[in-house]
């Protein structure tokens, strides 16, 4: 059995068409909900990214895996390599693509998982969005930039930026227009990378677990035309 786990960031149940929202259009999610199984009584073990994602990664509650906040304050900071995690699926090729946010310094390779992570908003500290400032440096080389080069795309730039009024959340509250096409955006990059990993496993005739992580619709809202 192959597993593709797709995780979005900051999506409320009532914001989906399958649960009755009249404005937001989610046709593909609605189709999955109609043809698959809905877990109507599933609840996140934590209200912030780090602890919740670590619970998905390990199958443990935050009180057990030790990461209880975004960052090291009040917790262990990293997941013990002795803890259960998806990298220990026997006989599986395991991949992570996109946002990671498990621990504070660890990367997928620490747990025997292939892939690359870049946390934060967009590609923090990488210079891809040159007119934005991020505080968290990348933990991997800039694979997104390499992918853009491979595809013959220019590096997208942000224009018409509107920041929020909260001085501590100005970047998080940002809305802006991204140059280029939707095919140059990070979500397209994530899907393209995931397809490559899946094709690799199919060629090896091995089962795979691919964890695909998008930032959206978490702010900042940086989108190209026509959105």
Predicted regions and their residues:
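A structural signal for well-ordered alpha-helical segments within the folded catalytic domains
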Residues: 1, 26-27, 51, 77-85, ...
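Beta-strand elements within well-structured catalytic alpha/beta cores of enzymes
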Residues: 1-12, 31-32, 56-58, 86-87, ...
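Active-site-proximal N-terminal segment of extracellular/periplasmic enzymes that hydrolyze or transfer
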Residues: 1-37, 46, 225
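Active-site-proximal cap/lid insertion segments
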Residues: 10-23, 132-227
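Short, solvent-exposed turn/loop segments enriched in Gly/Ser/Thr/Pro and often Arg
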Residues: 18-20, 36-57, 73, 96-107, ...
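Glycine-rich, phosphate-binding/catalytic loops in enzymes
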Residues: 20-25, 49, 74, 112-114, ...
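Catalytic-site neighborhoods of secreted/periplasmic enzymes
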Residues: 60-180
């Amino acid at each position: 059995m192959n597993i593709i786990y797709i995780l979005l960031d900051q999506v409320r149940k009532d914001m989906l068409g399958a649960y009755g929202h009249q404005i937001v259009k989610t046709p593909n999610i609605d189709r999955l909900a109609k043809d698959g199984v809905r877990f109507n009584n599933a609840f996140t073990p934590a209200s912030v990214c780090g602890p919740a994602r670590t619970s998905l990664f390990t199958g443990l509650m935050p009180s057990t895996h030790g990461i209880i906040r975004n960052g090291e304050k009040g917790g262990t900071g990293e997941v013990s390599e002795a803890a259960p995690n998806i990298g220990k699926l026997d006989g599986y090729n395991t991949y992570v693509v996109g946002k990671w946010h498990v621990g504070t310094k660890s990367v997928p390779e620490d747990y025997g998982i292939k892939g690359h992570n870049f946390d934060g908003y967009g590609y923090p500290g990488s210079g891809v969005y040159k007119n934005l400032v991020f505080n968290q440096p990348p933990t991997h080389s800039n694979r997104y930039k390499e992918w853009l080069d491979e595809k013959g795309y220019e590096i997208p730039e942000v224009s018409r930026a509107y920041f929020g009024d909260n001085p501590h959340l100005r970047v998080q509250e940002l809305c802006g227009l991204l140059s280029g096409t939707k095919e140059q955006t990070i979500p397209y990059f994530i899907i393209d990378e995931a397809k490559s990993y899946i094709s690799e496993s199919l060629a090896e005739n091995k089962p795979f677990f691919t964890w695909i992580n998008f930032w959206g619709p978490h702010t900042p809202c940086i989108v190209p035309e026509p959105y």
